[in-house]
Amino acid sequence: LKEIYPDIPVVIGGIEASLRRVTHYDYWQDSLKPSILVDSGADWLCYGMGERTMIEFTKAIEAGRNPSDIRKIPQLGFYMDGKCRLKDAVILNSYERCCKDKVAFAENFHVVETYANMLQPPVLVEPVGKGYVQINPTWPPATQEEMDSFWDLPYTKLPHPRYKGKHIPAFEMIKFSVNTHRGCFGGCNFCTIAAHQGKFIQSRSEESIIREITALNKLPGFAGNISDVGAPTANMYGMKGKDPELCAKCRRKSCLFPGPCRNMDRSHERLLKLYERIAKVKGIRHAYIGSGIRYDLFLDEKGFVDDTSYPYLKELILEHT
């Protein structure tokens, strides 16, 4: 594409590019690969959930803004020749060093994961070849109004037209599912959700979710059964820290391990109210919870953690399985 249209900026994004934004292990070739920006030749990389980044980026392109201004847009990555001159950037181990030293690679992974879970992360820079890859900080967590605006767009909920007439097993599993929020503060070592969505929960309003569920009735083949009302972790909807200032200083990747954070509000009240409203939507026979559940959000060694814990577990077992 760049050979045909060398002056057209190429932007890559999505979870595949997002998780390859710095040095990473490639299973197929059993080797460490540099940032996907280097191998792909793309000009820009939008990582994480990219609505705000792409809106800002397209506005900047349309307005003819200076590339130096574009390089300040949050959640954008790019490759530059030479050495980084930013004084406040965190410099990672180079790609070449990571290839020679597995400890250096582990250090990079730890740094990237730590800052992916912070509200105010710095710029990350990874030297590679004769230049460097710069990864800008994330946006602040999306507000409820922003989350609603993302989901209230007129999506068809259908596969790309190129797959017309073909059976797609993955689509069958999710075509009648509904997403309630983004992010996960579980911090499981095997999971990369936080590297893509962050650990801070960003929830939609009940009204937005109910609008989507009501619209399911118009989809061909819908028989009243929702396969999943969930997210990375289904029962984190509406949860957040009691004191935002403490969250802003936090460097923990998990709010639950090795023990639940005392600043975390684990009430399931909002989720119970949402389930109650879903049950009243005309045409809905059953709303399953297909996403994962964190039992340590409502149970500990002493039993149920608050007065919403038992009602939630009862509702989950009797109505959503």
How should each PLM-predicted stretch be described?
Residues 1-129, 135-140:
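Glycine-rich beta-alpha loop elements in corrinoid/cobalamin-binding modules
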Residues 43, 150, 184, 188, ...:
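Conserved, mostly hydrophobic/aromatic
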Residues 47, 67-72, 158-162, 199-203, ...:
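Acidic/polar loop patches that form or flank catalytic/metal-binding clefts of enzymes
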Residues 166-192, 223-225:
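N-terminal pre-triad scaffold of radical SAM enzymes
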